[in-house]
């Protein structure tokens, strides 16, 4: 969705406010040239203050982008586009983020075993055009339903003990072949499950560029 404007888009200073290997990989494979800034946002929001789990995810993505912008401003840098993203796993209206321990990871996978859960990835984009002095933002989230097969306690224990998925929302990474073998079906954007909804991101980047940077 952005291939025809990629050359022009890549003339902008674009920041990815994430050090996630998968987000870095897939944004790069899309052909976008960008720099990486690790946002210092602590991700310590009170979930009970949000009307929905998706609002919580959106706010995390927003604050990641905003904090990255503040960090760059302190270094006298002004990018054109900052992309913040956050992913959560949702089951029974409960949020499964990155587990804090191996035991918590095992508990998460036990709850998800044999069931359909939802992966929500929220994206927040801050933009600034220095030529027109215009700025703004855009936010969205993408949902993908993932169905797990039945996972035995032995399988869960082996996976967690050997692959230690403490950096994965929901305690699994679909890009890891062992974890991919848990998945019976996927309904929605595969890349969304990895942490970056490529299709929806492309649509939003295109709209931001055409509306705010394309010379009329």
Curated annotation (Swiss-Prot):
Its cofactor is a divalent metal cation. Keywords: Cytoplasm, Hydrolase. SUPFAM superfamilies: ITPase-like. It holds the Pfam family Maf. InterPro entries: ITPase-like_fam, Maf-like. It is found in: Cytoplasm. Its main location: cytoplasm. GO terms for cellular component: cytoplasm. CDD domains: Maf (cd00555). Its EC number is 3.6.1.9. It catalyses: a ribonucleoside 5'-triphosphate + H2O = a ribonucleoside 5'-phosphate + diphosphate + H(+); a 2'-deoxyribonucleoside 5'-triphosphate + H2O = a 2'-deoxyribonucleoside 5'-phosphate + diphosphate + H(+). Nucleoside triphosphate pyrophosphatase. May have a dual role in cell division arrest and in preventing the incorporation of modified nucleotides into cellular nucleic acids. Belongs to the Maf family. This is Nucleoside triphosphate pyrophosphatase. It comes from Dictyostelium discoideum (Social amoeba). The lineage of its organism: Eukaryota, Amoebozoa, Evosea, Eumycetozoa, Dictyostelia.
């Amino acid at each position: 969705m952005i291939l025809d404007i990629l050359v022009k888009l890549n003339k902008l200073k674009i920041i990815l406010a994430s050090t996630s290997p998968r987000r870095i990989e897939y944004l790069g494979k899309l052909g976008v040239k960008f720099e990486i800034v690790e946002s210092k946002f602590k991700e310590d929001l009170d979930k009970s203050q949000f009307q929905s789990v998706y609002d919580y995810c959106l706010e995390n993505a927003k604050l990641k982008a905003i904090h990255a912008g503040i960090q760059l401003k302190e270094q006298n840098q002004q990018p054109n586009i900052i992309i913040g993203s956050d992913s959560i796993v949702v089951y029974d209206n409960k949020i499964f983020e990155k587990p804090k321990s191996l035991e918590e990871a095992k508990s998460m996978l036990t709850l998800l075993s044999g069931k359909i859960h939802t992966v929500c990835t929220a994206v927040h984009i801050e933009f600034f055009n220095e030529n027109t002095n215009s700025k703004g933002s855009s936010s969205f989230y993408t949902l993908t339903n993932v169905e797990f097969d039945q996972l035995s306690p032995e399988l869960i224990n082996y996976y967690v003990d050997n692959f230690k998925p403490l950096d994965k929302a929901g305690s699994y990474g679909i890009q890891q072949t062992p974890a991919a073998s848990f998945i019976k079906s996927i309904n929605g954007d595969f890349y969304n499950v990895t942490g970056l909804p490529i299709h929806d991101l492309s649509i939003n980047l295109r709209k931001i560029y055409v509306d705010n940077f394309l010379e009329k």
